[in-house]
Structures are given as C-alpha cells and as structure tokens.
C-alpha cells in the first residue's frame, strides 16, 4: 500500500527542497499533497502553480524550506510551449471551449520572427479569467466557470528570451524565459492574435525556476516506486538543502555571540558585510541558519531563521 492511499500516516519533521517533475493532468496542489504524504512531512508548500495541462519543474518545499519559498515565487522561469494555430479558446489552452476558428495565413520564419520581436522585453499582459488571481476573494477561474467575467488590470512582465523552436502549418513551438507573473497562455494567445489567426496552448513544460533546472527533476512515479521498496526512508536523498533556495545571496559567517543575538531577533553589526540586500547567515560552525537583510544603518536584521532540529 502506497502513502497516497494509506488511511493514516504519522508525520515527521523533514526539511528540504524536492524538484518535482509534475505530471500532466494533475493540479499543483494534488502533486504537492502526493509528495507530502510520500515523505510523511508535517509541512509542505510549492513555489508557484503550474496548470493541470502543464508538466515540468515544480519545486516543493518541505518543513523549514517553506520559510524561503518567497525567493522562488519571485524568480525568473523558463518554459517550452507548443501552440495550435487557428483556434482561440476561452482559457488559452486546450481544456476550455473554442471561441473562434480562423484560417491560418502562410507563415514564414521571417514573418514569425518579426511578430515575436514585439513580445520581447517589457510587455503588458492582461491575465486570463482562467487564472488563480482573485477578485473579492474569489479565484478568477471559478468565476469564469460560472460565466462571469470581471475587469482585470494590465500588468507589466519581462520576456528575457523568446525563441522560435519549430513551426508548421498548424502549430508553433517556443522557448520562453520570463519574469515572475508571466502567463504563458496569455502570451501565446497574444502572439496568435498578432498573427491574425489566434492560437492556444496544447503542451507546456516548465524547464527552469531561478537556478534550478530540468536535469535536477524527480518524477512522481519514481518516488512512488522508491516508497514501495523502502517506505519514506529512501526518499530523503532526493531533497536539496535549504540553502540552495537562496544561494544567489552573499554569505556572511557569524561569530557565536553574533549568531546568538540574531537568533534572539536582534539586528547586529558584522564587519565587511554588504551594504544592502539580503544575505545568507552562517554560524561559527559554517552551518546555514537563515536569511538576514542589511538595514540602512548597516546592521543585519534577521528575516527568515531556521529552527534547529
């Protein structure tokens, strides 16, 4: 019997980051709950939803890792996306009703590149009604399913890279490197409108979140097979250390007294510290203890500290 169908499971404190390769046809929360049960984890969270249709990198934070999830929520992300041309849908993907069908113009690489060039850099996006954004506490997608449409504010996002991977008479494949808050379904819908024929997503795969990339992903089916062999005891080796979530911040090594005062919630002075931003905090034994922020008076204030097990 696997953890996913066991009626009662004990829960344990376990800390780390799992880079899950989310299967298609599953919500991000369903994937999260499956992983949480497999690891018998007391606490778990993810760092940004993927559509049910989508596959790929879904970082799952267990235990103390949840304290640092904000640093991945705000990170750049990369995707590969395949769209069908000539058909526009309500949600921008293949899982909602068709809105329009239009003939597809003869497309050349030059014409496609010219169209895509308008979507590189800082662009405006209007989020789809089929999104997790909320209106008066209600997710937009729930309103959309009731046939209700509300006004959405346009937001600015940055498309760092938009590469044409392939195309034919009916479809287009793109690589997208983008800022947080970018809706790939909306991007493809807008590209389809710019081409004059409409388009919608038929396949979407997240390849990268911050410095985490697809080569590090673990499939859910593999975790379940490992669980069946040896329960949760063999799974912890797939967890990455907490510090990997914030490895892009400079590290500061603290004396024992400085670490003590920081862990009591006090801001401290540290020689040769950076002048601004976040820093990784390491104690006198060079163990990661959390994240601090440089204040205007050059002191370091604790922001996220881990609980010692």
From Swiss-Prot:
Q: Which reactions is this enzyme annotated as catalysing?
A: uridine(55) in tRNA = pseudouridine(55) in tRNA
Q: Pfam families from the xrefs?
A: TruB-C_2 (PF09157), TruB_C_2 (PF16198), TruB_N (PF01509)
Q: Which GO terms describe its molecular function?
A: RNA binding; tRNA pseudouridine(55) synthase activity
Which key words tag this protein in UniProt? Isomerase, tRNA processing
- Asked if the Swiss-Prot or TrEMBL record annotates the protein with the keyword Repressor, the reply is no
Where does the record place the catalytic residues? 51 (nucleophile)
Query: What is this enzyme's class at the first EC digit?
Result: isomerase
Q: What does this protein do?
A: Responsible for synthesis of pseudouridine from uracil-55 in the psi GC loop of transfer RNAs.
UniProt record similarity statement: Belongs to the pseudouridine synthase TruB family. Type 1 subfamily.
Q: What is this protein called?
A: tRNA pseudouridine synthase B
Q: State the species of origin.
A: Coxiella burnetii (strain Dugway 5J108-111)
Per the record, the gene is: truB
